[in-house]
Each structure stands twice: as C-alpha cells, then as structure tokens.
Amino acid sequence: MNIRNARPEDLMNMQHCNLLCLPENYQMKYYFYHGLSWPQLSYIAEDEDGKIVGYVLAKMEEDPDDVPHGHITSLAVKRSHRRLGLAQKLMDQASRAMIENFSAKYVSLHVRKSNRAALHLYSNTLNFQVSEVEPKYYADGEDAYAMKRDLAQMADELRRQLVLKKSRYVVLGSEENQEAQDSTLPDAEEACQPENPAGKGSEACQPENPAGKGSEACQPENPAGKDTGSHSTDVQDSSEYLDSTS
C-alpha cells in the first residue's frame, strides 16, 4: 500500500471512491477546486496495482478572524481495504501538510452523529474533540458533530525531527570535510623521509646497516666502478474502518 499526494489525474477515481463509500457526494468541479487551490493537502491510498482505494480531500479555511486552520472535506476508504490503518495515515499526512505549508494550528471536520466507527477513529486515535453539535447539518436532516484536532503537538514533533535532520547533515558534513582533509596529508612515513640533498644512496632502498656492511636487500651502486654485471630488484573492495465527510 502506498500513500501519496493526490494529482489532477486522480480526481475522477477519488470521486468514484466517494460514490462507493459515502452518501455525501460532490460534483467534479468541487474536487478541482480543492486540487487547484490546495494541491499539497489531499492524499490518496493506492494498492499494489496502483488503484485508488482511499482518499482524503482537504483544504484551508479562509477565515481572516481566526488562526490558520485546515478542514477535512471528505475521507473515505473502500470496504475491501479497511482496518489497515489507511484512514489514520491519510489524516496524518493531510494534517502534516497543513502545518508544513500553511502553519495550521488546528484541523476541523464534521461527522454524522450516527457514524460510530468514524467517531471512534477521530476521538480515540486522532485526538479530535467535539466542539459543537450542528443540527440538521446533512441533507437528510441528521445532526453533525463539529470536531477539532489541535496540531501543536504534531508541529512540535515536526520541528524536533527537522532539528535532528539538520544536525545529522552538519555532523555528516564535518566528517566528510575531515576525511577530505586527511586524504591530502602525507602519512607519517612519507612525512619523515629525508629529501637526501647530498644525493647519497637511494630513497627506494635505504641501507639499514650504518656500519657499512653489505646487504642482499640493498646492493650498493658500485662507486668504485668495478664490473659486477647487471643487478635488478623486482617488487612484487507501512486501523481504520470508516467513511466521513463534511
């Protein structure tokens, strides 16, 4: 299962999912209104074949007299894919996007008083609180619970994760700089080799015998000029069960 941001080409399948799951339905222009105005806020759940099995349609409320806050317009998951935690993941993704993109302080929604499964998810899992009852909110005359979820705790957690992420980058960058610096420095043996300005001996083969005795590992260069023949040395890697709209 995959949760991702909804794209324009997903809107028709989102509407189809809505028609299968909910009594509250919307014309396609309403989906486009959300998708064009707040493209960051709506998400879909798709199965292994790329088919949409759930969605959340969300927006920001345009109330100049209130703090920035989002609203869940519609949430649905097909019956064949319920109790997999998809509704909770969709809601959390939308809420997180509201914080990151619009600094939302809370998110609101409406739910039918008779929708016990949705009420259980919102109240017990997602920490929504009932703010008021709106009489005859739905077209069939049923009342709705208006609910709100404070996003301060989620915002704090997102800030904490961001700080940790930045600190990891700083530490990683420091380690890479140190490795780069170390790679440019000579090792201890190279740093201690004399440059032999007098021209004596060979840097590749310094004699270990200061007393002047011969060594098989390092033959002298025959300064006396005697013919000794040729001499060479070879050196040998991711639970829900609901429908909800407002």
Swiss-Prot record:
The lineage of its organism: Eukaryota, Metazoa, Chordata, Craniata, Vertebrata. It is found in: Cytoplasm; Nucleus. It is an enzyme of class 2 (transferase). Keywords: Acyltransferase, Cytoplasm, Nucleus, Transferase. GO terms for molecular function: protein N-terminal-serine acetyltransferase activity; protein-N-terminal amino-acid acetyltransferase activity; protein-N-terminal-alanine acetyltransferase activity; protein-N-terminal-glutamate acetyltransferase activity. Residues 1-152 form the N-acetyltransferase domain. It catalyses: N-terminal glycyl-[protein] + acetyl-CoA = N-terminal N(alpha)-acetylglycyl-[protein] + CoA + H(+); N-terminal L-alanyl-[protein] + acetyl-CoA = N-terminal N(alpha)-acetyl-L-alanyl-[protein] + CoA + H(+); N-terminal L-seryl-[protein] + acetyl-CoA = N-terminal N(alpha)-acetyl-L-seryl-[protein] + CoA + H(+); N-terminal L-valyl-[protein] + acetyl-CoA = N-terminal N(alpha)-acetyl-L-valyl-[protein] + CoA + H(+). One of its GO terms (cellular component) is NatA complex. Residues 1-58 are annotated as: Interaction with NAA15. Its EC number is 2.3.1.255. It holds the Pfam family Acetyltransf_1. Component of the N-terminal acetyltransferase A (NatA) complex composed of NAA11 and NAA15. Interacts with HIF1A. This is N-alpha-acetyltransferase 11. InterPro entries: Acyl_CoA_acyltransferase, Ard1-like, GNAT_dom. Residues 230-246 have a biased composition (Polar residues). Belongs to the acetyltransferase family. ARD1 subfamily. Residues 175-246 are annotated as: Disordered. Displays alpha (N-terminal) acetyltransferase activity. Proposed alternative catalytic subunit of the N-terminal acetyltransferase A (NatA) complex.
